Amino acid sequence: SERKTERLAQVVSLCKLTELLDRHPYDLSGGEQQRAALAKILLLNPDILLLDEPTKGLDAEFKQVFGQILRTLQASGVAILMVSHDIEFCAKYADRCALFFDGNIVTEAEPRTFFSGNSFYTTAANRIARDVLPDAVTPEDVIAACGGTVEPEAELPEYQRIPPAPEKETRTVKKLPVWRKILAAVS
């Protein structure tokens, strides 16, 4: 349908896949495969996203787009749980961060508190500026604290979640009599 085609074009553009459409999936780089997987998920219009290392292979430019996509999804009511070793990305885009060790959550807080109070698992910006700016966890924090101006993120192309399709009619199935269930189990 026209609506599906329009939606597909929107997601392909958002995930910067236009130039890849004629290529075989085996010819895509790891980052391109991640973008294609993201597009596939976005087309499903999920209510919950469970992401495992979603930034692996993504270039810095698309990580920023991906972060904006996550913020847009969250603002529209999508629940997002992400497992990642990409500390810089988590510091910038996560609402809460946690550290797992030996199968347990050892510590958990909002990103600024989590990364500024952690000497082992923290961002490069925090390691560099820790003695002067202990609360700085992103390069943008350091730039702003030094009086510089941080460029606003580029606008995300128009993206909206499509409402879910109307639920299909459900048919009620007649229950089998007990004797038929027993007969089915025996045969």
Task: Tell what function each PLM region has.
Residues 84-85:
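H-loop/switch region of ABC-family ATPase nucleotide-binding domains
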Residues 121-186:
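ABC ATPase nucleotide-binding domains
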Residues 90-92:
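A short, surface-exposed alpha-helical micro-motif characterized by mixed small hydrophobic
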Residues 3-20:
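Conserved ABC ATPase "signature" region
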Residues 49-52:
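Catalytic Walker B motif of ABC-type/P-loop ATPase nucleotide-binding domains
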